[in-house]
Amino acid sequence: MLFKYWVVCLLLFILFIQARASSFMPAVTNYLAKDYEAGYQNWACAQGSNGEMYFGNSQGLLVYDGYRWTLHKVPGNHIVRSVYVKEDRIYVGAFEEFGYFKYSEAGTLRYHSLSKFLKNFPMENNEIWNIVELDGRIYFQSFSAWFSYDGKMVHAFRNRQQQPLYFYTQNGHIYTQMIDEDFYEFDGKDFLHLFPRSQVNDDNVVALLPDGDDSFLMVTENNGLFRYNGDITPWKTDIDAELKKQRVNRAVMTNDSIFMIGTVLNGIYAIDRKGHCLWHFNLDNRLDNNTVLGLFCDKDNNVWAALDDGIAYIHHNSPVMLLTPANHETKLGMVYDIAHRGDCFYLATNQGLYEYHQVTENLRLLPHTEGQNWYVKDIDGQLFAGNNAHTLLIGEKGNVSVISNTNSSTCLIKCTLYGEEILLESSYANLRIYKKKNGQWTFSHVIDGFIAPVMHLEVDQSGVIWASHMYQGVYKIVLSDDLSAVKGVRHISHLGSEYIIGPIQVMKMRGRIVFSSPNGFYTYDDITRQIIPFQKLNAILPYIRNAHSVVSVTNDRFWLSGSHEYVLVEYAEGEYIVKQRILIELFDSPCIENYNNVFVDNDVVYFNLNNGIASYSKNTDSLSPTLESALSLSSVTASSSDKKEKRLPLSGNVELESNYRDLLFSVSLPHYNKLSVHFHYVLQGGQGMALTSDLKEPEIRYGSLDYGEYTFQAEAYNDLGQKIGEVEYHFAIARPFYLSYYAFALYLIVLTALVYFFSKWRANRAMEKKRKEYEAEQVQQNIKMREQEHLITLQQQQLLEAELSAKSKDLASMALGVFAKNEVLEKLRTVVQESLVKGQYGRKNLESLLKLINENIETQEFWDVFQN
């Protein structure tokens, strides 16, 4: 009997664990230290009025707006253990330090210490673990003291007989769990005893949860939950036994009254107001760490968990829920198709065909289905599945039978050919037909004349079969009237004028054949019998290429599956409209390209994932962020030509020096659901400039701006193109000095001086030129005068020479005459002298004659004169 008892207990436990782990649960986004670039441990969470999230991290205050993580240190670089936000202040507590951060005019967080204002109270070894507010006062609680701040003064309190373990606020009161002591209410001055700890099994109350105006729920560390309304009674849950073993550390209630309980040893539990467990996150399914140090429910009703290693974001308010295997040992693989029958879902995966029971939440692999399964489909109450080996028929109890004469199956559709309703099946080799017999679909025959691997089939209104080749192009097939053979086949590798490398996806929308390729959507025109671009669809879906499936919700609503997203399209008044976009990255479960399909079941849409499926309630129109988080300008940074940077005020009239011409604008739109948001930026001003940009990033940089006044505008749009926020900023860049009015005045003075000096220089130059011309003229005149004088001199010389020549001739003649005369006279004188000597003449007469001769004979002086 004892053995049977333990076996039953073990089986129940296993069933419980399977059911608990294999349920639809919210998506979880995990952030690790490498993502936010700070310490591993996170102790507390809070949210600002602008939607930003703040975390007490082992390295300081961590800030996140959905795009950027920033870390802000506190004095001493200590761990931030507690965070509390009131209006524009972010209060923090750390080791021997507490105070608040506040944004400056330039959007920079600055720390203001409050503990430094304490008088006559040493902060030695006091570490602030909790921050609460009551009646406008902020209380900072350590394990040995508490401190109050009224906005002006800081006061310290200590009671060595009563040392608080936790401060909590509930119903407008502060309650306190004392260390190894009882439970109290704190009125701001004194502690009022409420009950002894023995009434909660000698345990510590670690959290309080709302439970009406006059009562609340107390969450204990090791003994579950208790209701307090003056009396104390246990509050039963489905997980009391587990909570007693997992060491509860934190708890919070969501806006829709779901209790989140965080443990030290086994992650997070969610229970409703009746104590029923909704789901459990731990290291085995969604969380990256089991130790929960803080919990917080944000404005969007999603839950943040501060973990011993990282941060977890639970998409509690999302209409998307995920189903994943019970534990790490079960691997679904990639889910290719989903079917629903009764209480069970059937999942065709590349590992096999799985059955998921909604009531027991049990997930099992059906026998003989191992390997690649391409589809599972309920057709008129019969459940078919196709895999690499056979076509399968699934019975009511999950029994599997193989349909004979089938060797593989890739697609099975219900259609009408030549007035007869049939099932048409494709495979790796041939096409097959099923017909109804005794109200059941049974295999009929293989179609002759066609052998090719086909991935998907569609049949148009004229009975033409369009078959997507598994690797290249698409086939257009016409069957014989008796459906026994192929009458005509054409392989198509072009869409329009474009040659398509690879398979061409074929789909059906509103009875119309649609093709998808890397170049967009095409359709078959029944009138022209040509494949033409599907302009209306391409116009609204420019971001989807190579869509691989279409699933009809109604005749006018369709889900299209692309490689990176799912899109809900509606046809209304002759136009197609995008109603919803869901990015695959929302699921943190990458899919194999071109196999992420959709299954629609009443009001719920299911998405195929890798190792799971996601459900989405169609009652929710949009996953897009609302104006709960407004678009704001988070920073404006200006850079100068010499590489200096400065943050600018975010409001007022801002004017920059002329050398600050490069600006970086950062905007903030806090949202955390991985939704498709894009930003439209416009910068106008300067010298008639207008720049427009559309980006995914929440920042934009402008460089080398001209001087002048500018207006910067940023707008945020959701995935449907709806504007969800806008912000405007005005600034001016001063004229550079060389273009300033002072510079122009200086330029005028300089120009005037230049004109003056130029005029003067020009006048002087003209005078100098005239002087030089005059001097040159004088020189020329002098030269001419000298030439004339020289000519005159030459003429005079010539005249003198002529006269001289004439006179020379005369002189020569005279000289010759004189010479001749002298010779005669000399001879005569000689004769006379001889006669005189001889005494032939009278001496007196001769002397007289000789005297006369001597007087007429030229002397030596005469000859000298003649020679000269």
Question: Locations of the language-model features?
Answer:
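Carboxylate-rich, polar loop motifs that coordinate divalent cations or form catalytic acidic clusters
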Residues: 1-733, 740-741, 745, 749-752, ...
